[in-house]
């Protein structure tokens, strides 16, 4: 049974389904009370949903003890909060890491996957970003900073004993279930489907690795199911850049006439070039290939929203 923290979240819920499709029974953990009716009812006994927070050792151990947990995929993440409350964010992030490693030791789990971020590459000059790039220690945003720190702490804790820890440096993910309008794709898709204005300036030329959530989930599931992994860090994305202008053009093929106003050029506060991930390691060790291009993913996403889902 694979424990997936954040198992009802955006990426987590899709990952649970991807694992189940590969024959893996899942324990989907959520900090919130389990909804009624429980999610994943269509998957029967392949998925069990439990209330457990990774930063709460007692609830985590109650969830996993006696359940033959054989793998851990840690996708839950605390919200950073305002600048004056960042200590609580850091504490929750570190507590979750240590609790999961404690659980892995108690349950005999050989491998723990930790969700990291494309953001750890901030300041790296060369693209595509490779896992062996030398990361820059910059005053970066709190979430990438925490992800970078957790990667280092996990390596220290498991250096001589403990499970294999695998870092997942995840691209910008989009698709059904994303509650945030901040990323480029949900912003433009909601504007097109709802007939609303585009929120905030979106610079037309800023290309980045925009990976459809089903592809991301399948990549994580393939890594979890791989017998052997040759690396401790994997980029997870589609391995190519796409710009907001390309997203707009693809949307107009599905929703002709949608009013999608973009700001010309690149964000003056951005890196000044396209950013995307090298996914060679992922491909070599799992055989992964993205199944969704922009047009296919957008058609599915549009259909989801038009089917009555709020996000």
PLM-predicted stretches and their roles:
Residues 51-92:
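NAD(P)H-binding glycine-rich loop region in Rossmannoid oxidoreductase-like domains
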Residues 5, 29, 72-76, 112-118, ...:
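SDR active-site strand-loop-helix element
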Residues 78-80, 118-127, 171-174:
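Active-site segment of SDR-like NAD(P)-dependent oxidoreductases
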């Amino acid at each position: 049974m694979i424990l997936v923290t954040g198992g009802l979240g955006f990426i987590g819920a899709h990952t649970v389904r991807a694992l189940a499709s590969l024959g893996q029974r899942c324990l989907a953990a959520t900090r919130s009370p389990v909804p009624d009716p429980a999610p994943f009812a269509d998957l029967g006994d392949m998925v069990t949903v439990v209330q457990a927070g990774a930063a709460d050792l007692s609830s985590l151990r109650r969830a996993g003890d006696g359940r033959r947990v054989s793998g851990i995929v840690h996708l839950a993440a605390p919200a950073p909060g305002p600048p004056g409350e960042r200590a609580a964010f850091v504490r929750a992030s570190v507590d979750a890491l240590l609790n999961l490693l404690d659980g892995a030791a108690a349950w005999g789990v050989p491998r723990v996957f930790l969700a990291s971020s494309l953001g750890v590459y901030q300041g790296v000059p060369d693209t595509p970003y490779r896992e062996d790039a030398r990361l820059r220690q910059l005053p970066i945003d709190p979430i990438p900073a925490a992800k970078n720190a957790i990667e280092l702490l996990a390596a220290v804790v498991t250096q001589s004993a403990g499970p294999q820890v695998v870092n997942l440096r995840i691209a910008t993910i989009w698709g059904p279930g994303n509650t945030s309008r901040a990323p480029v794709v949900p912003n433009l898709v909601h504007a097109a489907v709802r007939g609303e204005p585009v929120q905030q300036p979106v610079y037309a030329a800023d290309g980045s690795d925009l990976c459809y959530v089903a592809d991301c989930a399948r990549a994580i599931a393939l890594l979890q199911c791989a017998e052997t992994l040759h690396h401790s860090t994997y980029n997870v994305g589609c391995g190519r850049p796409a710009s907001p202008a390309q997203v707009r053009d693809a949307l107009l093929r599905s929703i002709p006439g949608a009013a999608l106003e973009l700001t010309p050029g690149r964000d003056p506060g951005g890196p000044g070039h396209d950013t995307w991930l090298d996914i060679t390691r992922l491909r070599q060790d799992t055989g992964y290939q993205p199944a969704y291009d922009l047009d296919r993913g957008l058609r599915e996403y549009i259909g989801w929203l038009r089917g009555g889902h709020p996000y």
